[in-house]
Amino acid sequence: MVESATPADRRALGEAIRKTVPRTSHAAWSPPGDRADPVALLTEQDTDRLQWLVPIRHSRMAESAFTFYRGAAKIMATDLAGTPSTGLSAQICGDAHLSNFGSFASPEREQIFDINDFDETLPGPWEWDLKRLATSFVLAGRDNNVGDNDIREMTASAVVGYQQAMARFTTMTTLDAWYAHLTLQQITDAMPKKKDRAAVEKSAAKSRSKGSLRALGKLAEKVDGTFRIKSQPPLLVPLRDLPSEGNPDELGRVAERSFAQYKGTLDDNRRVLIDKYRIVDIAVKVVGVGSVGTRCFIALLEGNDDTDPLFLQVKEATASVLETGLPRSAYSHHGQRVVEGQRLMQAASDIFLGWSAGDQGRTFYWRQLYDMKGSVDVSKMSARRLKVYATLCGWTLAHAHARSGDPFAISGYLG
């Protein structure tokens, strides 16, 4: 963005880009003759993962076209690198499919709806995120046996929701646009049907119950008077039970060093808070689809006593799949890349976000495991509800891009 340009100038810039990159140029895609082998791209990702978890990744991706898509961010990033680009950049998610949106607690304890996965985040073309979001609705609709007309409508709802939200942000002050956010209460109030309002309220109530104390009962058990994370291989495996990852005591020491580094990345006030806790156990925990096989841990921390738990997730951060077609991150530490990107894109972020290094040059980021986190079961959504959800996702993605990009130029291009 040119700082001296007026809003009218910036909007005109977006409109002018239509002449060189027509909006219709985004409508079609066909694989080039030299397209990278999709299977080879997935296999390449597998080489540095925990090999005993790779089959789980493959089985989860094989469940349906949509679940394959969830794990295929690298394939799509490689394909998008050869598509027309507006040249308008923003901090982008890199994996903005519909299941990477959800609810969680803001630091002010509001339940808000936002993007919740930033493993691939990098500055890049805003339209890449929008294309990944729109395509995810096509595939989810097909998996749900939704008709073609409804699929077109829900996909259009995502794009129009983005377009209208971006236009709306140009009418706000800079600060108002920055602070804009969607709460579950706002979403509930906006639902036109009573049964839809009831569904959101039920989901919100379920999410409110998700915290570290509930997770303690689900993920841990008392052993000799002390809570320890349960062993539920292969999806949940404490360090003490890892099959081939080295000496458990040494792994524990690495974890403690990593924890100390992580605390050093927090703001002073939050470091004071985390210093009130100590780690009592750590385990490998399988999460998601595309992330399966990366080194993802959960740490059980204890505050005043064993009725005062805190669960943190410690997730390996590797190079963004977007680096296939974009410059490398300005951050050499990929954990920091994820955290800084998340803070820039989200309306409100987890107070415990931070990063650290492990052994062998690996990088990680830390966040709360459960803090009123909620998500929708897309497989059970009707076409009508998918359309509503698509509009919410479109608004949310537009807001994430407007925070770092130029809403006037993007809105000018979209019209």
What are these model-predicted stretches?
Residues 3, 8-11:
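Basic, amphipathic N-terminal segments
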Residues 10-16, 20-23, 33, 37-93, ...:
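Conserved ATP-binding subdomain of kinase catalytic cores across diverse folds
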Residues 185-255:
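Long, low-complexity segments enriched in small/aliphatic residues
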